[in-house]
Amino acid sequence: MTERGKQTVVQVFASAGWGGGEQYVYDLAERLQREGYGVQLVSRESEVIRRKTASLGCPLVQFPLRSRFGLRSILKMKRLIESVEADIVHTHQFKDTFIALFARALSDRKPKVILTRHLVRPAKRNFLYSYLYRRTDRIVFVSELARRVFLSSSPKIAARSVTVIHNSIPPCRLQTGGVVLRQRYGIPPDTVVVAYAGRLHPEKGVEVLLDAAALLKSEDFVLLVAGQGEPVYEQRLRDRAKALGLDGKVVFTGFLDDVPQFMRQVDIGVVPTVGQEAFGLTVLEFMQAGRAVITTDNGAQPEFVASGTLLKDKRDELMKQFLEIVRRNRELRELLGAAARKKAEEALSYEHFFREITAVYRDRS
């Protein structure tokens, strides 16, 4: 416990890179510190993690974390649990959870071990994982879909050990003096700006979006594709846009530093994912920005997105039809955007998320 009587939480980053899961840990660590909790960060050897977390002011230690049976990592985790007097070890993938459980078994100090599950996959049912399910104090799923698919393989796990807490993101802090989007890309004032923001990967559906844009290329709009991916795949997308005759209609912006500022200057956000997402944070970011957002229904999106903006079919023709309706009707865009912001501020607020996750930390059952 800290001097303010709050728990000390060890947060374990799931990878050496930086993505939605790492941002989840960063945001939670920042808020926990502000509320008086003790926070200790753990990650694999990673300069990215070290650089990104420097501004938090939390202590960071880096372990190998290569194997669930890595003795060096287990012993380091044991010593860390004891030295910081940890009350909670919060992990974000199974491999790290094994390390936390084995470390706790070796230690006189017995912190709660909590796992947040960020993926949509059935549970494994072998002996080792049955051990993990019995020993982990709580498994938090970021969506009902993630929980349902996990339990579909009938793992041996107590119902009280499983809970759903929808992801959230803190209200964005807009930077002042940012670039005006239309000026940067030479977009006329009346041209509708459609945007995708996120990782460029086949499962994200950007190719479907390009095909839909090609069906609308005689209309007055510009599609901004913001984000990065593997260079070969990025080039494939650029080549596809060129082959579809979308020169002047599609702009690949590359990586953006201030995504919230970007989102607030577009008219329509599109998240055309073709893979099952446990919880699409990009959708929530567009909602926070008060933008009309069009997305597919193949992940957890139906749990938090209005049905009117969900596409039940990922084909380009259907996406084209919906884009055309929203693009042509400014009043509809504004109505959808206002409803999205209201949902983000109420049911999906970071305040709500933080209350739920800290209630799990405090729960003594």
For each feature predicted by the language model, list its residue ranges.
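Active-site donor-binding acidic/aromatic loop of nucleotide-activated sugar
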Residues: 232-235, 247-256, 262
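Acidic anion/phosphate-binding donor-loop and adjacent secondary structure
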Residues: 68-72, 148-152, 160-161, 166-184, ...
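Short hydrophobic beta-strand element within catalytic cores of glycosyltransferases
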Residues: 41-43, 291-295
